[in-house]
Amino acid sequence: MSNGDIWVGTRKGGLYTFDANLQSKMTNQYFHSNIYAIAEDRQGRMWTGTRGNGLKVGDTWYYNTPSDPTSLSDNNVFAIYRDRKDRMWVGTFGGGLELAEPTSDGKYKFRHFFQQTFGMRMVRVIEEDENGMVWVGTSEGICIFHPDSLIADGDNYHLFSYTNGKFCSNEIKCIYRDTKGRMWIGTSGSGLNLCTPQDDYHSLKYEHYGTSEGLVNDVIQSILGDKKGNLWVATEYGISKFNPSTHSFENYFFSSYTLGNVY
């Protein structure tokens, strides 16, 4: 967060705060559902997304209300992102992408995007590249757009999926932007992919790394880089450390049981 604190949400509903030295702070909170996303807005308020229990902004909860077209489109909130203009984007798993728009009473209404297909409504992750383009990982592939353009026209985005032949997978689990600005995509079943937009984002070049290249498992849960430029790739069966310079993997297991190696 902006003050250096680290916020950790758990699947048992705990929200814990640590300082930069990993010392616990007495601001722990508990929810009645899994916490899947945490972000901070420009006012310093915490946005917390849950599985099945909606979105909390500061002290206010937002839920799906079928009779209100400006309410949250789904109560499963898996991703929250603050863009370069401090706009807050919310990814729901079932209702697509949301733009939170402030109202005169200090609360929010929600504008809905990516309602076209069932898979596009399943949003897991939101990330921004070095050009200010936003990448959204869904169950229908990768949607890439410029925020200003999408707000002006809800159909102004680029979709790269297995279905349309522009990517190796539909199921996008995670997106990571490394220190060199490169975009790495983790998929469910198609491993790790280094993606490079071409032709003004009309096409996507990707380099694939799967089990045949040394990755421990092709179902990726998360990606994180270290200070040496390595990528740590958490999968459904172990963790891989990937060196982008040598294209080599080192694999790690921490349990003799299969379920103990799911990350």
Task: Please describe what each predicted stretch is.
Residues 1-263:
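Carboxylate-rich, polar loop motifs that coordinate divalent cations or form catalytic acidic clusters
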